[in-house]
Each structure stands twice: as structure tokens, then as C-alpha cells.
Amino acid sequence: MSKPGLREHTNFANDVKVYGPIGEQRLKEILTEKGHNFEDVSDIEEFRIFDIDILQYNNDETNSEKVLDAYYMGKTTSAADAVAYEVKTDTYGIVSRNIVFEDLSNSNSGCMARTKADYLFYVFVNKQNEIVEEYLINVKKLRWWLMSNFGKINQCDYLQSRSMRRGQDNTGIFLINIDHLINDKTSGALKLK
């Protein structure tokens, strides 16, 4: 029996294509409302390897090449006068109350472990594809929080590890309770909606 608001089956590759744009569009709306200059780089291959979807520029210039140059030189987006966002749209989080931190994917670093984004914009959507909750999470602080709580994995209710197999892909994830994360001021997580 399925839980209310939860789809019974999931297809990860399809979910990224179907649900991913919902969160990306919402972040673009927020940046537009705030008058920020930004660029959607989610379809640019060079940014996919860094798991970056949207660049917000701190001036009137949009120059994704400058950002790429900074990354390849081992610098951060601040060197390119930009802020980078990774967007996650989650159809299960409204029920589980967890965000997913993918640490391992197909024997490589998972997207959350390797992202060069400054912020994670994480949204929970319901069965009707409506955004129910929005979070902005500082990626560096989240990683620090995870390392600080590493000894508590699977020994508390707010941090669990799982391994999954999707076809040939072996995936290692951490399930982090979003409510706990929001209440822990060291986590870098902020609830927007």
C-alpha cells in the first residue's frame, strides 16, 4: 500500500528529466524576483562534471567561461564573482523527511560528494508536481556537518546510510533528516518555504 503523496515506483533517469526542471525553474524564479543575474548551465557538459545547474553572477557580466577557468585552476566561484547552485527535486522527501546525500555512484564519487556548487537548492514536490518545501543548504557546511556527525551514522534517527543497486550502478547514500538539519545551526541549512 502506498503512502499519500508518494509514487509507488521510481525510475531515477526518468525522474531527473521529469522532476529536475521543477526545482530548476523555481530557483530561476527566486533569482529573477531578487533581481539577480544568472545563467542556467545544467545542459552544458563542462558544468555537469561539477554538478552545477545554475550560476548566479554578482555583477552584470555573465561569463561561465570565467567560472570554468576558476574551477580548473582549483579556485572557487568567488574567484569568478559568481555563486553556483546544484538543484535537487525530491519526490520522496515529503514523506521520508530526508534529503539524500549521494556519496558513491558506480564506484565514483556521487553527485553530492563531488559537486563544486556553493549551495544546494533542495525542493520536495508532491504527487501533483507542486513544490511543497524549499531549502537552501550551504554545501561546505553540510559536508562539515556530515563529517562531524559521522560517528552517529545508523545510531541515531536523523542520519542513516544505505547502499542501493540500480542496474549496474552501485550507489551509496546518506539519508539526512531535514527537520534535524534545519534545527542544527551548524549544518548550513535554511528552510525557504
Where are these regions (language model features)?
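Acidic-basic catalytic patches of nuclease active cores, encompassing PD-(D/E)XK
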Residues: 1-59, 91-92
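Conserved catalytic cores of phosphodiester-cleaving nucleases, focusing on short active-site segments
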Residues: 31, 54, 70-93
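Beta-rich catalytic cores
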Residues: 66
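Short, conserved, surface-exposed binding loops centered on an aromatic residue
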Residues: 62, 71-77, 110-114
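Non-catalytic C-terminal interaction segments of nucleic acid-processing enzymes
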Residues: 3, 11, 33, 57, ...
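Catalytic cores of nucleic-acid endonucleases
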Residues: 10-14, 39-40, 47, 88-134
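Short, solvent-exposed secondary-structure boundary motifs
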Residues: 55-62, 102-106
